[in-house]
Amino acid sequence: MFENLSERLERSFKILKGEGRITEVNVAETLKDVRKALLDADVNYKVAKTFTDTVKNKAIGQDVLTSIHPSQLMVKIVHDELTALMGGETADINYEGHPAVILMSGLQGSGKTTFSSKLANYLKKKKNRNPLLVACDVYRPAAIDQLKVLGESIGVPVYSEPESKNPVQIALNAIKEAKAKSYNLVIIDTAGRLAIDEAMMQEIAAIKEAVNPTETLFVVDSMTGQDAVNTAKEFNDRLDFTGVILTKLDGDTRGGAALSIRTVVTKPIKFIGTGEKMEAIDQFHPSRMADRILGMGDVVSLVERAQEQFDEEQAKKLQRKLARNQFDFNDFLAQIEQIKKMGNIKDLLGMIPGIGKAVKDMDIDDNAFKGVEAIIRSMTPKERANPDIINNSRRERIARGSGTTLQEVNKLMKQFEQIRKTMKTVAGGKFPGMMPGMGRR
């Protein structure tokens, strides 16, 4: 996430490394580099200029303590201004109402339907809401089917009227259904288009007027950069939405949309999508995002994700087994499942301070876990519970059953032994660590 921008900014700050104090000359030189980095990241030109002008005014004339290097002070100023640029404070979503109604808008391909389901799942699990998803895309039958499949996967019902071509009436009927069946949250997925057109705008505006939503959220693909900002402005001019959702942020190495959109539309970014899984959704925290952009990681979000998957009873059981050196492949498989639920592995590593740059060019693939899982699931229950009995003939059978090679099985057995030894020494810890060699090709 934003790796290219992070690297460029880090290079810019090196200009001040050899300086004893901040001057107008070295600040100008540094900020010239910073502005170019922002523009190359597809940040809006006016936003980039205003940002660097503000940083310059705050930096020049600053008294630098002897214990603080000029480059450190510049990083602090840039961090504070990046935070302000992205909204300053975390913007909560309004889910109060009987029912609360959230209207989703955006172009086709922005990830709107998927995010509607993610949001329903998030509010159901974290805020104890009882959501109803509504399929109001009357032009694409596949969109209704997609929402139904996603809804079923998270245990959330989907209201649809496949024969109807009136999205306004569908939305109104869905709200009646929600009231009748005590759903306290309605999330309306609307039709998208490949480009903005008048008919699309009139339709979504009519739905908004009819249902009077608690929130109107604009979903945008962050990887489209400046186009995302321009589209957001057009939607906001017509819809006056209440917040922005940035999807596909895990694949965005530049960051132009995240850094520009708040200033251009004066509406907060409320949530971000960070992967394909239903759990790959985070509330947007400007300060934490500034940390990540500046290569400081985001330990708070990492710990929060771990806590979400933390099962106290399971942890106590594992701790007892570790103390007795009884860690087996059943425990190993459970740890893999926990880590997978936390999100994209490369994204997780990027949250650790100093690691983001190191993993930037690594080929880290979540699918690598599939081979490991296949090997473990090809073991008998007795073998999983007693790894020491897995001799060479058993390994050959496991390799055949899992569609892998004997070498891959041997490699996993060796890794498992290393993990077992390591985990015994840290038996008092509760945080599931990254397993040596896992996920890397």
PLM feature spans:
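Long amphipathic alpha-helical segments used for membrane anchoring, targeting, substrate engagement
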Residues: 2-19, 288-441
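Alpha-helical scaffold segments in soluble metabolic enzymes
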Residues: 4, 11, 33, 77-84, ...
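Primarily NTPase-proximal linker/entry elements flanking Walker-type ATP/GTP-binding cores
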Residues: 8-136, 143-164, 170-190
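Conserved phosphate-handling catalytic cores of large alpha/beta enzymes
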Residues: 172-175, 179, 183, 195, ...
